[in-house]
Every structure is written in C-alpha cells, then in structure tokens.
Amino acid sequence: MDQSGDNLSLQIEQVGSNNKILLYDSGSKITGDDVDIHLHQHNTSSSASTNTIKLWHLYGDDNAIRWGQGAGLTNSSDTTFEADTDDSGGQYTMIDIHGNRNSITGYQMNAGSGAHTADIYIWGDDNSAWIRQKNNSSKNLDLLIKNDDNEVSVLQKDHAAHSAAITLDGSYGTNLNLTQQSTTAQSYTLIQNCLTIGGCNISVIQQ
C-alpha cells in the first residue's frame, strides 16, 4: 500500500469470515487531499463465498467513498451499515477514483444467494453516485463517468438477474436515475455525452 499525505480518514469494518479489501496491484495508491473512506463488509458464515473490494488507485481531492457488502444503508447520507444476516457472500466491487469532488457511497447484499458485481470508475470533477444492488441473483453493474457534474443513482433489486453498463463520459451537468427491479431479468446499456445547456436528466425504470 502506497498511501501518502493530506487528511485521509480511513475506517474499515469487516465482520465475520471471508472478507477482503485489496489494492488492485503493486502500483496502486491512495495519494492525498481530503479523501474520506469508510468500507464495511459483513459475512458471518465461514462457508460463505468471499466478499472482495479492490480500491485500485484513488488519487486525491475531496473524494469520499463509503461502500458496504453484506450490509446496507437507508440512504446516501446514512453512515451506519445494517447487516443482511441472510447474505451468502461473494460480492465483488472494484472502485477507481482519480480526483476532484467525487462521492460514491453504496452497497451490495444478496439476501441468501447470487453474488453481485459492481465495477465503478470515476475519474474527475464533481460527480456523485449512490449505487446499491440487493436481493438474490446476479445484478452486475459497470459504471464509468470520467468527468463533469454528473449525479447518478442506480438501484437494482428483487429476485432476478439484472445488468447495467453506464458510461456518461462528461460534458456539463448530467442526471441519471436508473431503477431495475422485477422477478424477471432486466438489462440496460447507456452511453451518454451531454452537451445540452442546463444538463441532462434521464430516469429509467424497468419492472
């Protein structure tokens, strides 16, 4: 781990067995500025699959990350994770933030079966993402934002396999609210580059 400088506040909570928080490789860093990281993983069964979070880089500025696996939050301002006692583990998240005023939050829990996967990459500007995936079967998510004033909220829930790959890729303000829920599988792919004055506003619900 190559952590350096400024007002980093790091709190890691891991309850039970088979929880891992890693840096992606030997070149990974957590570099500086007012980064605040709070990670929580809950996996009480020794036979459950391993929960894994890979932080990868995280360079600087006023970033804040709060991510949970096997436990949930009531809203994006909540700082106390509530455990899913039926969770079977196997959640995987990679987080890669490079700079500016980003904030992620979010969690994954599966209520008994079906490991979830979230790959999140946010590289710059005033982005915010409040992402959560819960309930059974594989939800999947691949989110890449890159830059500008995006605000994203994604919920994937209920007992079916959902999938979402969202790119956005910056240019002025962008709002996205995606909800995928149902007992039947949903799928969504969005690639957006918004140049509209005043920003973009998209809301998708599949149920």
List each language-model region with its residue ranges.
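Low-complexity repeat regions of mature extracellularly deployed or surface/particle-associated proteins
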Residues: M1-Q207
